[in-house]
Amino acid sequence: MAGSRTNDIKVYCSFCGKSQDDVKKIIAGNNVFICNECVALSQEIIKEELAEEVLADLTEVPKPKELLDVLNQYVVGQDRAKRALSVAVYNHYKRVSFTESRDDDDVDLQKSNILMIGPTGSGKTFLAQTLAKSLNVPFAIADATSLTEAGYVGEDVENILLKLIQAADYNVERAERGIIYVDEIDKIAKKGENVSITRDVSGEGVQQALLKIIEGTVASVPPQGGRKHPNQEMIQIDTKNILFIVGGAFDGIEEIVKQRLGEKVIGFGQNSRKIDDNASYMQEIISEDIQKFGLIPEFIGRLPVVAALEQLKTSDLIRILTEPRNALVKQYQALLSYDGVELEFDKAALEAIATKAIERKTGARGLRSIIEETMLDIMFEIPSQEDVTKVRITKAAVEGKSKPVLETA
């Protein structure tokens, strides 16, 4: 029941006491009434309390060592990158807490957005995901290659913010303190010398569009996504406290670093500094190299923290398979244990899985698919074979030369 009179009885709001003649609308419940003004006031109170809860959470940000401990539980290797990320994330949320709790403007703390550079499968996305999970903040992933500047067919940059809002269950206050990871950022680089005629002409435009939300702005986001339309209802979100982490492989950037350092082909009379491999060059990257690769100076300036990740070696991939809390070997052992079957991987089998991932140039992200290929038939048959007690995965099984070894009761 809503609106004016019922059986000629005047209705009053049970909360403020105003009559139906004094307000726009009164909503009826079970022997209780509430007016539109009290509904609006209630929404505002709830909104403020939610914001206070978010702020209270941020006052207890884990210290860098604590963040590193969490990362070490899930991420193998990349020690320098993990330390850099731990410090940057701690400083970012400390800045948010500091800014929200102070009324004066004596100190203007800038955002510590992060650029991660590393090959495919080195753990860039997983690092960002793990940080967001450990902080219990909303997290969203976007692919830079799907974004376009205004006027092109594709996805508006504001849709990245919509993903974060959705991850926060449309709680804008929580979303405003979340983390966004933008992958493949190197694919929208504006090429420097020897520009290819096939390069993405909108790459620089996308950087400019991303720049606005990364540096901090109040953005209007279509609640259903897609392009903006006149008279469309929008969600307003302030991005000044959203942590942006962008990542990419930046294939070939080590050559730019070599040129800057004056490295040449080793020959007689040359006194150049010796660096063992490309991984060492990755640790030498500075903003000048990134600009030469094709990111615009303004964009680079909003990414003060640069974390370089190394190509994972066979030993790293074996550790990833076995050591973390969510290690793949542990996951598949748990799956088979539900059928009462023990699962064992030979050491040579683990080495073969890691070698395959390196050969395919997929890094850590390719490990699961290799195990799936190896165990598909086994996982299909095992539930129907009640006499099987143990499965042993051998090197030959990984290489497709034989089937896994089965032990029966």
Swiss-Prot record:
Q: Where are the transmembrane segments?
A: none
GO molecular-function term, one example from the UniProt record = unfolded protein binding
Positions that bind ATP: 119-126
Q: Which GO terms describe its biological process?
A: cell division; proteolysis involved in protein catabolic process
Matching entries from Pfam families are given as: AAA_2, ClpB_D2-small, zf-C4_ClpX
Keyword set includes ATP-binding? yes
Specify whether Zinc is a keyword of the entry. yes
Query: What InterPro entries does the record point to?
Result: AAA+_ATPase, ATP-dep_Clp_protease_ClpX, ATPase_AAA_core, Clp_ATPase_C, Clp_protease_ATP-bd_su_ClpX, ClpX_bact, P-loop_NTPase, Znf_CppX_C4
GO-annotated cellular components:
HslUV protease complex
First and last residue of the signal peptide: none
Binding residues for Zn(2+), per the UniProt record?
A: 13, 16, 35, 38
Q: Which UniProt keywords apply?
A: ATP-binding, Chaperone, Metal-binding, Nucleotide-binding, Zinc
Q: Where is the ClpX-type ZB domain?
A: 1-54
Q: Which SUPFAM superfamilies match?
A: Glucocorticoid receptor-like (DNA-binding domain) (SSF57716), P-loop containing nucleoside triphosphate hydrolases (SSF52540)
Describe the function of this protein: ATP-dependent specificity component of the Clp protease. It directs the protease to specific substrates. Can perform chaperone functions in the absence of ClpP.
Q: How does it assemble?
A: Component of the ClpX-ClpP complex. Forms a hexameric ring that, in the presence of ATP, binds to fourteen ClpP subunits assembled into a disk-like structure with a central cavity, resembling the structure of eukaryotic proteasomes.
| HAMAP family registered for this protein in UniProt | ClpX
> Which family does the record claim for this protein?
Belongs to the ClpX chaperone family.
In Swiss-Prot or TrEMBL terms, this protein is called ATP-dependent Clp protease ATP-binding subunit ClpX
